[in-house]
Amino acid sequence: MQSIDTLTESLNGKRVLVVEDEALIAMLAEELLGELGCVIHAVASNIPKALALVEAGGFDLALLDVNVARERVFPVAEALAARNIPFVFASGYGEQGLRDDFKSRPLVGKPYSGDHLEKALLAALAQ
């Protein structure tokens, strides 16, 4: 079994797309991801921008708020899944806010802590 330090090393340098419409939560995500050794690829505050960033690529995984600017993030999740890019959902509503076909994907509750975010990201990379 790998140590926590070894697992965390697997996040070092990973480029993350953050899809979050609330500025303070996006800033918290950026801070926590940085502490985990990740690099922020971009922050998208709406679905069209997120889809354009997914199309352009250049990142290793994504953190997706389930509700972005009054829209569901599922088109972005579908685009990521089609490209085999790992992702984590973030929601204050728990699993009940997810579509059935995405309930097997890692979910981190909001507000999230560094520990919970780290575990969810590692789970996404392992899928």
Region roles according to the model:
Residues 1-15, 99, 113-127:
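Non-catalytic signal-transmission and effector/linker regions of two-component phosphorelay proteins
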Residues 65:
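Active-site residues of response regulator receiver
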Residues 110:
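A Lys-centered signature of the CheY-like receiver
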Residues 43-61:
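Acidic, metal-coordinating helix/loop segments flanking the phosphotransfer/catalytic sites
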Residues 71-85:
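Short amphipathic alpha-helix used as the core "switch/output" element in two-component signaling
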Residues 23-42:
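Two-component/phosphorelay signaling modules centered on CheY-like receiver
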Residues 20:
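Conserved acidic carboxylate
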